[in-house]
């Protein structure tokens, strides 16, 4: 059973997360060869102030 953590900067809609979750689940089913109901996704929304890229 894969447990996949997805961290995103806040601001994504529920629909965007749903579509991303469906795509990730399909990839896990195709690549790891597990049934879709065995794939667990955990979405974490990060505040923009809690994220930094390139030291900025």
Regions found by a protein language model. Give the residues of each.
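A domain-level signal for the structural core that forms small-molecule/cofactor-binding pockets
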Residues: 2-56
């Amino acid at each position: 059973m894969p447990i996949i953590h997805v961290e995103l900067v806040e601001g994504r809609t529920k629909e965007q997360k749903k579509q991303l979750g469906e795509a990730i689940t399909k990839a896990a089913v195709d690549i790891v060869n597990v049934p879709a109901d065995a794939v667990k996704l955990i979405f974490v929304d990060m505040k923009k102030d809690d994220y930094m890229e390139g030291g900025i």
